[in-house]
């Protein structure tokens, strides 16, 4: 039935009444399972979310596991075929004051409404709810670990939308009802803070959010707000990557010391500076830190430019393609000014220039121009200069006339410090035993550490629970095996199958919403489960540039904290990939 013209509360009650009637006729549910719904009431509809009040955490657990799919299917039918997703709110215990206790008549009325709604008989169409769940994929062949992860993760079963919200002021001051591990508070978040997405309706007028207690009173509870990446349009520097945010240890102390000297301008003998090491160990961070320090601390302000080898290549090719079309300002002159009139040139992933003779020739002359002008040059690579493949000896010798430093995988103490800083940036308190657990299990690089912590934060955010060792164990139980080699083609093929697409759909130029989401998840998993650089991942995905990959990875990481279905997609695919490779 169409209830769009009703107020949010009436619309919710109408849809929920029809939903209960549909579930009542579901022959696959036992009387015991249906009994859990007797005390559930609808509070409001906001966009495509229906807020449901439940009496206790035990009921919530059943609704978000055993009854999750039947509820979503029935809600969609009751909403006229349009997706409607539940957000559950555990109601606080009744206060002892007589004036705040619901009357027996009110309770009886709710129960009567629930019982009287069971009159229609419509079977839910469970296959129409998401692009992914097929009978084959949700049957007994599904890995038990994946099912357990999904069961433990769900708090709001919404495939592509936001966390749970409330449309009214709380009845009691938050300080009187502190947040607990079961989150016995209303789940609230203002709609104004959520970016609009397709299929998501506008917020309700007058929506307000209760004031949470100060963070000092929310020991271990999650506060949204992950620090983002901001790239300066002129320098291309990420303002978040500074020496202050670079955690040093035995594995990178020398590299940081030399990098700081170059940034200060005192390390003239360190020109050029070559930083090498494996993926995800902090090379790019040091490049940005050098640039940010120089810009912020030196007078006059130096001209700084950070680029990847891919960007350098693309700029040169574009300058050749358009050269001569602008007689007053030829394209090549623009290229020369951009790269040869800077005071500090920072170039990342230099190894990808190997074998590109024309590009290397241009870089050779750019290097000489800057070096002869006593300008600073810093390059980063995955190998030391003498191991660069398909580079001319004359260029390698110029790299080696400065200083070469390496960054190694961080030790345990450094990994713990990195995790603590990441937690602070996400405004979440993480107990030391959790930091130790993650640091002990993920030892290869910083990217692994960050990925593991993000999964834990996402779980805490979705369930509105504090971060504990138990939650961390449950969240990461399928990700502690890190010695499995995953190929990007395996990831793409698995993601394509998962979303009922083809390999070519994922790597091709198509941009339908379903394909774009699958492609972004595949990019995120490739970044998370391999040591490939952003540029190399972009090449695998149809020749896309590294900024596209970077955006996709950040987008999925952010949405995992907001949208239950995105979180489930990533978790299930990770489990399936490791399960497949271990078979």
Curated annotation (Swiss-Prot):
Positions of the UniProt region annotated as Disordered: 86-179, 197-232
Region Domain IV, binds dsDNA: start-end pairs: 461-583
Region named Domain III, AAA+ region: 236-460
Positions with biased composition (Polar residues): 97-106, 205-226
Chain segments carrying region Domain I, interacts with DnaA modulators: 1-91
Gene3D superfamilies the UniProt entry points to: 1.10.1750.10, 1.10.8.60, P-loop containing nucleotide triphosphate hydrolases (3.40.50.300)
InterPro entries found in the cross-reference section: AAA+_ATPase (IPR003593), Chromosome_initiator_DnaA (IPR001957), Chromosome_initiator_DnaA-like (IPR020591), Chromosome_initiator_DnaA_CS (IPR018312), DnaA_C (IPR013159), DnaA_dom (IPR013317), P-loop_NTPase (IPR027417), Trp_repressor/repl_initiator (IPR010921)
Annotated binding of ATP, by residue: 280, 282-284
Summary of subunit composition and partner proteins: Oligomerizes as a right-handed, spiral filament on DNA at oriC.
Entry domain remark: Domain I is involved in oligomerization and binding regulators, domain II is flexibile and of varying length in different bacteria, domain III forms the AAA+ region, while domain IV binds dsDNA.
Function text: Plays an essential role in the initiation and regulation of chromosomal replication. ATP-DnaA binds to the origin of replication (oriC) to initiate formation of the DNA replication initiation complex once per cell cycle. Binds the DnaA box (a 9 base pair repeat at the origin) and separates the double-stranded (ds)DNA. Forms a right-handed helical filament on oriC DNA; dsDNA binds to the exterior of the filament while single-stranded (ss)DNA is stabiized in the filament's interior.
Alphabetized HAMAP family for the sequence: DnaA_bact
Protein name: Chromosomal replication initiator protein DnaA
UniProt organism field: Bifidobacterium animalis subsp. lactis (strain AD011)
Lineage of producing organism: Bacteria, Bacillati, Actinomycetota, Actinomycetes, Bifidobacteriales
